[in-house]
A protein has these predicted regions:
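PAPS-dependent sulfotransferase catalytic domain
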Residues: 103-182
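PAPS-dependent sulfotransferase catalytic core
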Residues: 2-103
Length: 182
């Protein structure tokens, strides 16, 4: 019987013989991306060491690189947006000074944290908005990217459960909003 450790070693050896790869785990909050990212990590994908700590609404952990989240947050702020803003990014954002700054920071992060990695994964709900930026940085860094998209069908019930965990006095959505699975 093969142990989990030897399976991980086999996966890493196979990947080392091929192109360096990164898996972009894409999905909104509460869509299962934390579980998917942790599974990828257990199967041998590096995720970095500077991870967001677990929280009351995600006791198993988010499995998100804290610096990636900070870079995304700064870019959103520089573009006049916030994480929960549904508006499109501004016209020409990709060529803006803010995007160039984020691109440089991501390149440094990748070179520092994942330079020796043949396979790694990155997850942050904000990542969906910045895929073009990531594709460019990864290509320049010598990585081939693959995207793994979390199905959004679980989001309403998971979000509802999260709201009730974080605010026991009120498990309902804020006034003027609704969640429906139909």
């Amino acid at each position: 019987m093969t142990t989990a450790l030897s399976r991980t070693s086999l996966i890493r050896r196979e990947v080392n013989a091929q192109t360096r790869k990164v898996i972009l785990v894409l999905g909104m909050h509460r869509s299962g991306t934390s579980a998917v990212t942790r599974c990828l990590n257990l199967l041998g994908a590096e995720i970095g060491s500077k991870l967001l700590p677990p929280a009351a609404d995600n006791r198993s952990g988010f499995w998100e690189h804290a610096d990636v989240m900070a870079i995304h947050e700064e870019l959103l702020k520089d573009l006049g947006r916030v994480w929960h803003d549904a508006r499109p990014l501004p016209e020409g954002w990709f060529l803006s000074p803010a995007a160039r700054k984020a691109r440089d920071k991501l390149a440094r992060l990748i070179a520092g944290d994942f330079h020796g990695s043949a396979l790694w994964a990155v997850k942050d709900p904000r990542l969906c908005r910045f895929v073009p930026l990531w594709r460019e940085v990864l290509l320049e860094s010598g990585f081939e990217a693959a995207a793994l998209l979390a199905a959004p069908s679980a989001v309403p019930s998971s979000t509802s459960a999260s709201i009730s965990l974080s605010s026991p006095a009120s498990a309902t959505a804020p006034s003027g909003t609704s969640c429906s699975t139909s």
